């Protein structure tokens, strides 16, 4: 049993950090309880121990703390989350406390929010298709169960609408196993929080979801704990309750800003653009908690969403995220300004595991071929449009004009499906064939003839 030690030796409080002197037997990540002179209590966590001094990060802010009268208790255990299957359908704050007016959770157990390291040998390869209902993802950048696939957005782009759409529509095809969504929002405004909660309530998606909401006016230090708390809940549902769990985390940029704020308070030597030098390592402790385990039915799939400052994909946050994750979905400001929703730019987007989750028995036999042909045709159509801007449309061949027509319809009908349309993978594939029928059959060089005979709409082919 852990021994609780109490001290009244607080020597300094700087921002979200507290220094406690003359401590003994204190450990890194240990949970700390602070009792103020008015009897109120706050929580913190040991961030660093040097000789007889402990640095504590405070989850609820440092205002109102009297150095002489504050009592600090070291509990001897890490920060833990009470977990239960009853968490599904509930809404929590950033520290895992219910905020939906419902009863407290009766925990089956308490789990360390930092989780357990997963042995690479124990990992199972991701290979099962997850349908999001969004053609640009399902067909062209397929999401696979156990994958981590981030969304790179920008300020003012509709990533919150995209996140809500995925939370509503995502499902594992051809599976009778339970599916759950863990939705974690960090540093969002009250209006954004209301949007997410109302959207999931109105559509009924709340019944299979767990929400963790950290508001912009909550302490920055809480923002660092929020994704770890959410991932702990996801791992519990996946590995102990055999559920397929999709974790949507928005906005990771707010998380990294909080990390930079705490690093500055600790007076650490800054790295690129003021972020701590351990930003990559810290992000990996979140992203690497996705995956499947050998012998376990459940899985954890991640969609981290981040807004790129100044739309700069070389910024440290998207740059380091791209190194750790398995692809990226990129939102385009140009498509957004043209009125396309969701404005997914499919050409620079990538899912590195898309070939593992597609094909006969998973989606359909023509998935990979049509995906490659759509990419090639869209790229060629974009080039033709750029050429027409420079030289005029008269410089285009008849085939080039067909590619331009294909590109326009691809953006208007395929990408621009709206935030309320839920397309099955079959509907996305059929729409792809309909668009490809605009082009001459001789241009469909990435698809086998027997597949063209089977799927290409005959009426369109006869018209040409």
UniProtKB/Swiss-Prot annotation:
One of its GO terms (molecular function) is ATP binding. It comes from the Bacteria. InterPro entries: ATP-synt_VA_C, ATPase_a/bsu_AS, ATPase_F1/V1/A1_a/bsu_N, ATPase_F1/V1/A1_a/bsu_nucl-bd, P-loop_NTPase, V-ATPase_su_B/beta. It holds the Pfam family ATP-synt_ab. The keyword Transport applies. Keywords: ATP synthesis, Hydrogen ion transport, Ion transport, Transport. GO terms for biological process: proton motive force-driven plasma membrane ATP synthesis. SUPFAM superfamilies: C-terminal domain of alpha and beta subunits of F1 ATP synthase (SSF47917), P-loop containing nucleoside triphosphate hydrolases (SSF52540). Transmembrane segments: none annotated. Belongs to the ATPase alpha/beta chains family. Produces ATP from ADP in the presence of a proton gradient across the membrane. The V-type beta chain is a regulatory subunit. NCBIfam families: PRK04196.1. This is V-type ATP synthase beta chain. It comes from Streptococcus sanguinis (strain SK36).
């Amino acid at each position: 049993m852990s021994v609780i030690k109490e001290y009244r030796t607080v020597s300094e409080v700087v921002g979200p950090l507290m220094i406690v002197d003359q401590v003994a037997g204190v450990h890194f990540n240990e949970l700390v309880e602070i009792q103020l002179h008015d009897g109120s209590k706050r929580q913190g966590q040991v961030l660093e121990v040097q000789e007889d001094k402990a640095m504590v990060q405070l989850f609820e802010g440092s205002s109102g703390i009297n150095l002489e009268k504050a009592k600090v208790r070291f509990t001897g255990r890490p920060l833990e989350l009470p977990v239960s299957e009853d968490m599904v359908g509930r809404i929590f704050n950033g520290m895992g406390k219910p905020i939906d007016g419902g009863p407290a959770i009766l925990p089956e157990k308490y789990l360390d929010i930092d989780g357990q390291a997963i042995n690479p040998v124990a990992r199972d390869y991701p290979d099962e298709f997850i349908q999001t209902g969004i053609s640009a993802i399902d067909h062209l950048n397929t999401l696979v169960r156990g994958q981590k696939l981030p969304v790179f957005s920008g300020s003012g782009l509709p990533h919150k609408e995209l996140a809500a759409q995925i939370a509503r529509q995502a499902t594992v095809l051809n599976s009778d196993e339970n599916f759950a969504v863990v939705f974690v929002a960090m540093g969002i405004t009250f209006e954004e929080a209301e949007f997410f909660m109302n959207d999931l309530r109105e559509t009924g998606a709340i019944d299979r979801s767990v929400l963790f909401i950290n508001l912009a006016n909550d302490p920055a230090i809480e923002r660092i704990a929020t994704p770890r708390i959410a991932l702990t809940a996801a791992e519990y549902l996946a590995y102990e309750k055999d559920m397929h769990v999709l974790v949507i985390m928005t906005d990771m940029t707010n998380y990294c800003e909080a990390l930079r704020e705490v690093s500055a308070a600790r007076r650490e030597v800054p790295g690129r653009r003021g972020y701590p030098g351990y930003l990559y390592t810290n992000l990996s402790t979140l992203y690497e908690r996705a995956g499947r385990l050998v012998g376990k039915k459940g899985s954890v799939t991640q969609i981290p969403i981040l807004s790129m400052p100044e739309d700069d994909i070389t910024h440290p946050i998207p740059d380091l995220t791209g190194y750790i994750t398995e692809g990226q979905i990129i939102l385009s400001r140009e498509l957004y300004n043209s009125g396309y929703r969701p404005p997914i730019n499919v050409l620079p987007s990538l899912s590195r595991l898309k070939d593992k989750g597609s094909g006969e028995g998973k989606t359909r036999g023509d998935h990979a071929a049509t995906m490659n042909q759509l990419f090639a045709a869209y790229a060629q159509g974009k080039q033709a449009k750029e050429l027409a801007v420079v030289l005029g449309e008269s410089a285009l061949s008849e085939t080039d004009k067909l590619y331009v027509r294909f590109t326009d319809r691809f953006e208007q009908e395929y990408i621009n499906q709206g935030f309320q349309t839920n397309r099955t993978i079959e509907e996305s594939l059929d729409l792809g064939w309909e668009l490809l029928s605009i082009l001459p059959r001789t241009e469909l060089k990435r698809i086998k003839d027997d597949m063209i005979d089977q799927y290409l709409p005959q009426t369109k082919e006869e018209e040409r």
